[in-house]
UniProtKB/Swiss-Prot annotation:
Reactions catalysed: acetyl-CoA + 2-oxoglutarate + H2O = (2R)-homocitrate + CoA + H(+)
Species, as recorded: Sulfurisphaera tokodaii (strain DSM 16993 / JCM 10545 / NBRC 100140 / 7)
Protein name: Homocitrate synthase
Regulation: Inhibited by lysine.
Similarity-based family: Belongs to the alpha-IPM synthase/homocitrate synthase family. Homocitrate synthase LYS20/LYS21 subfamily.
Superkingdom of origin organism: Archaea
Positions of Mg(2+) binding: E12, H197, H199
Pathway note: Amino-acid biosynthesis; L-lysine biosynthesis via AAA pathway; L-alpha-aminoadipate from 2-oxoglutarate: step 1/5
Domain comment quoted from the record: Contains an N-terminal catalytic domain fused with a RAM (Regulation of Amino acid Metabolism) domain at the C-terminus. The mutant enzyme lacking the RAM domain is insensitive to inhibition by lysine, indicating that the RAM domain is responsible for enzyme allosteric regulation. Moreover, the mutant enzyme lacking the RAM domain forms homodimer irrespective of the presence of lysine, which suggests that HCS undergoes changes in its oligomeric state by binding lysine at its RAM domain.
Keyword match Acyltransferase: yes
Location of the Pyruvate carboxyltransferase domain: 3-258
Catalytic residues of the enzyme: H291
């Protein structure tokens, strides 16, 4: 089984109402997508506006420098002028889209089926004459007569396209039909590979993507956080996790998805719901007492994969649903030993206040002190994580400073960022003294003018 990801956050994602990426943000997102390992990046429709054009131009520069490794795709209407604009940017592939359902042919294009086939063939051939790979997107393919859709795919193949994307433009497919559709296309149109572009109008985009893989699709179109027109398309983090679980294939670096999701959340201005799969705040937090007891004994009782797979950690809520196992574990993690009687008393206090949404560690310590009559001293954390923002001197090359920082003991990750600071450094230390030494080592690096340290209190 072969399957990869085309991420369209920079094209489909920016079609989310209210979302606009700056040129710098487009470049940063492209670098992050490449780092996470997506096979293709749909970088935008360059004929739409100058900022998209400039963004793709800068992305292609990074591609030539080897800083981006994903295949870069430029979007285009089936119009020669659009194709020329994409071709002059020297993208790796041009994706030409055209509505092929009867409703699109009549209401939008005002052409016959035969005329549409001629347009598709002519524009694909024209794009190929510029020396680029071509994908054809059968817009509204899911509502297209099957026999005609097969003709469309054969026309695209014969004109030079090596891929055809079947777009479920209004999100009406369901898994059984999706599997049958792709199985038929793969069988009837040899010599062509197929993508699925699944919209989520009925909440079935991920399920349809999995079914398409079973039917023979080799590329899944995604956006980070499921952004896109109306209710969006397949979320990258969700389909990547599902493909790993069901097919055993790691299509991207799963442990980098959280960071990528947070980056796109920040730049898009669209917040992730806390109960969002994989990257939402609650994705690996347990609440019910019986759930927590199970997880403490064996995490797989209530987790499909370990949170560490995705760069996350598990946690649980302390409130009226909490059982004694969870309470004992929480106090042990705080370094506080309570007797069974004392634990029962603390639990009774918690359950006597059922309207409290959750109890923080400091709240639990206060309750325990009131129950025991003792002053309780929690142990300091065994490991300290911190994020250190670094500002560089104006006359230095930021990347050179980044390289110097990356070799300092205790430094786990170094990222060049936009904003008031130039670099973000993730560090881990055994104790405050070691953390202070790491900070001093960072400040001593040539080109560093100032730092700001933030301690990591909790990871979701």
């Amino acid at each position: 089984m072969k399957v990869g990801i085309l991420d369209s956050t920079l094209r489909e994602g920016e079609q989310t109402p209210g979302v606009v990426f700056t040129i710098d943000q487009r470049v940063e997102i492209a670098k992050a997508l490449s780092d996470v390992g997506v096979q293709m990046i749909e970088a935008g429709h360059p004929a739409v506006s100058s900022d998209i054009y400039e963004g793709i131009k800068r992305i292609m520069k990074l591609k030539r420098e080897g800083l981006i490794t994903s295949e870069i795709v430029g979007h285009s209407r089936a119009v020669k002028k659009d194709i020329e604009v994409a071709a002059e940017l020297e993208v790796d592939r041009i994706a030409i889209f055209y509505g092929v359902s009867d409703i699109h042919l009549k209401a939008k294009h005002h052409v016959t089926r035969e005329e549409a086939l001629n347009i598709i063939a002519e524009t694909i051939s024209y794009a190929k004459s510029h020396g680029v790979k071509v994908r054809f997107t059968a817009e509204d393919g899911s509502r297209t007569d099957l026999d005609y859709l097969i003709k469309v795919c054969k026309t695209a193949r014969d004109a030079g396209a090596d891929r055809v994307s079947i777009a479920d433009t209004v999100g009406i497919l369901y898994p059984t039909k999706t599997r049958e559709l792709f199985s038929t296309l793969v069988r009837e149109v040899p010599g062509l590979e197929f993508d699925i572009h699944a919209h989520n109008d009925l909440g079935l985009a991920v399920a349809n993507a999995l079914a398409a893989i079973e039917g023979g699709a080799t590329i899944i179109h995604t956006t980070v956080n499921g952004l896109g027109e109306r209710v969006g398309i397949v979320p990258l983090q969700v389909i990547a996790a599902a493909i790993k679980y069901h097919f055993g294939i790691e299509v991207v670096k799963l442990n980098k998805l959280q960071q990528l999701a947070s980056l796109v959340e920040k730049y898009s201005g669209i917040p992730m719901p806390p109960n969002y799969p994989i990257t939402g705040d609650y994705a690996f937090i347990h609440k019910a007492g019986i759930h927590v007891a199970g997880v403490l004994n064996d995490p797989s009782t209530y987790e499909f994969m370990p949170p560490e797979t995705f760069g996350r950690s598990r946690d649980y809520v302390i409130d009226k649903y909490t059982g004694k196992h969870a309470l004992k574990d929480r106090f042990e993690k705080l370094g506080v030993k309570l007797s069974d009687v004392e634990l029962d008393q603390v639990l009774a206090k918690i359950k006597s206040n059922p309207n409290v949404r959750f109890y923080r560690d400091v709240d639990l310590l206060e309750i325990a002190e009131s129950v025991t009559g003792r002053v309780l001293k929690p142990k300091p954390p065994e490991n300290i994580e911190a994020l250190i923002s670094v500002k560089c001197e104006s006359n230095v090359y930021t990347t050179a400073v980044t390289r110097r920082l990356s070799v300092i003991p205790g430094v786990k990750e170094v990222m060049e960022i936009s904003g008031d600071y130039d670099i973000l450094v993730k560090v881990e230390a055994k104790d405050p003294n070691e953390l202070n030494q790491i900070i001093e080592n960072i400040r001593a690096v040539k080109g560093v003018s100032s730092t700001l340290t933030s301690l990591v209190l909790k990871k979701m």
